[in-house]
Amino acid sequence: MSIILGIDPGSRVTGYGVIRQTGRHLEYLGSGAIRTQVEDLPTRLKRIYAGVTEIITQFQPNMFAIEQVFMAKNADSALKLGQARGTAIVAAVNNDLPVFEYAARLVKQTVVGIGSADKVQVQEMVTRILKLSDKPQADAADALAIAITHAHSIQHSLHIANSVKMTETQEKMTALLKTRYSRGRFRLKI
């Protein structure tokens, strides 16, 4: 069982979403947004850090997933986003959480099936995947989508690991059978 905290970073609004993954089953635990007022950047970063720390304390996640920085046209906006993202990561690391990063395009591809999906499509699919009665706010939906992407990544990794183990087992069994057959210890019955 994993409890995954997904974060959609922003210097004014940072979305969060928390899900529990048990095998292939995903359960919604909570979501929302950390909103900062029109204040100086250091104060906003302090609020983001405190907010993420509070969410970690409340939900006790054991994994932290966050959106990677994308290239923005406005350098100032990109720097502020990077600082907000870094602040959230520090809150996770200070609480001993492993940090996983996902590109926005991969998140949309995983949740919607289209890497160029818009926010409305992401909201709709998050609502369906988690069987929610109401659509979450856009920032919260993006954060939940990041958490879902991480859950999918875990499931995919387990599948690959099991496939590798199965392949190794099959190879060992084949080698054993070939050895026994070549030494006459094993006879094929047709």
Curated annotation (Swiss-Prot):
EC class name: hydrolase
Gene3D superfamilies in the record: Ribonuclease H-like superfamily/Ribonuclease H (3.30.420.10)
Listed cofactors: Mg(2+)
Active site (UniProt): 8, 67, 139
GO biological process: DNA recombination; DNA repair
CDD domains found in the cross-reference section: RuvC
Record InterPro entries: RNaseH-like_sf, RNaseH_sf, X-over_junc_endoDNase_Mg_BS, X-over_junc_endoDNase_RuvC
Main location group: cytoplasm
Protein name: Crossover junction endodeoxyribonuclease RuvC
